[in-house]
């Protein structure tokens, strides 16, 4: 059996160690791809914390969790239905997503400076970066079939979480606690 030639490979002409990391020097970089995220498709979703509270946008345009029956979710759809855009990731780190809401205007969740807020913007078609404040990695939680967690692509080890602050349950970004932190677990109910 003859070998079939492959045209999409990269020829390496050298190697070198820098600070205990092995780097390859490519013959030509025309086939190399930069790190990026490219938008694929989206889903309308309702997000809930482990107390079954629904994430919604309150009157102050802040993401908070509240007890809410399904009928209220439907009645308040622009504030409770989030648009989860999936992105192709040039690296394999989990499903890259943005979380947006179309309430008053299109806004996209950001964790800039580790503070959760909605930026008035539509998610871009592509992002030429390895990490970005609006990209999160959506992953299943081992041992919990229906639970999801969202890790920041910009701040490794930091996850979206639900935290009680005064009388509100707020969406925050926090460093994952290694002792089975349930505040970073969510259920995602897709509408389409």
From Swiss-Prot:
- Got a GO cellular component term for this one? cytosol
The highest taxon in the source lineage is Eukaryota
Gene Ontology terms for molecular function? cytokine activity; interleukin-18 receptor binding
Q: Which GO terms describe its biological process?
A: cellular response to lipopolysaccharide; cytokine-mediated signaling pathway; defense response to Gram-positive bacterium; establishment of skin barrier; immune response; inflammatory response; interleukin-18-mediated signaling pathway; positive regulation of inflammatory response
UniProt keyword annotation of Glycosyltransferase present = no
Give UniProt keywords alphabetically.
Answer: Cytokine, Cytoplasm, Inflammatory response, Secreted
Q: Where is this site: Cleavage?
A: 35-36, 70-71
Subcellular location per UniProt equals:
Cytoplasm, Cytosol; Secreted
The UniProt entry, under Pfam families, shows: IL1
Family named by the database record: Belongs to the IL-1 family.
Q: What is this protein called?
A: Interleukin-18
This protein's species is: Felis catus
What is the taxonomic lineage of the source species?
Eukaryota, Metazoa, Chordata, Craniata, Vertebrata
